[in-house]
Swiss-Prot record:
Keywords: ATP-binding, Cytoplasm, Kinase, NAD, NADP, Nucleotide-binding, Transferase. One of its GO terms (molecular function) is ATP binding. Homotetramer. This is NAD kinase. It comes from Archaeoglobus fulgidus (strain ATCC 49558 / DSM 4304 / JCM 9628 / NBRC 100126 / VC-16). The active site is at 49 (proton acceptor). PANTHER family: BIFUNCTIONAL NADP PHOSPHATASE_NAD KINASE, NAD KINASE.
Amino acid sequence: MRAAVVYKTDGHVKRIEEALKRLEVEVELFNQPSEELENFDFIVSVGGDGTILRILQKLKRCPPIFGINTGRVGLLTHASPENFEVELKKAVEKFEVERFPRVSCSAMPDVLALNEIAVLSRKPAKMIDVALRVDGVEVDRIRCDGFIVATQIGSTGYAFSAGGPVVEPYLECFILIPIAPFRFGWKPYVVSMERKIEVIAEKAIVVADGQKSVDFDGEITIEKSEFPAVFFKNEKRFRNLFGKVRSIG
């Protein structure tokens, strides 16, 4: 087997490389994500959740990812630098995976998002008028600083800071939530990921997972992609979710 190790800082890379070689895995190191990662049997990400999101932005077909958390919360990761060897050995030997949906956005056809698509005002501190449609049905029109269309995985990201609910990672859904809405009592919507979401706004930018962005005026469509993010199975993912959420901040 061949593994790509993608690292933000190289403090633990030597140990990870040696551990993989003991498992008879060929290793190639990358200090930046690359489209080449699609050609490997699996990927080891060394960093935080942001490192994994940057890796995913480069991939359409996604080999299984094993995350070693050197960041803060590490909701997407499997192990820490202190305990990764046991967990990595177990993952490689069992090779059980789990898939989480990513979403596509018509404004950025070459980019897929795992966490969210955010629509923001192009001008800082200036509100925009947003219209929201679900399967062609207008749900609302609202003035706000922006609007987030998040996945269940993204419920603990930007949507969380905007007041959205925490959703368990295996419940596939869209969370629709405005940023700083100019209205009393606005509540998020949670809808099936089989729905088609349309957001209409002017003088806006659209951002995928806090990484890539483009300007747009008019309408964008957000839908579930046929290319999921693939991770090694993490049996503690649900069990650890709420403790990690409590640790945020």
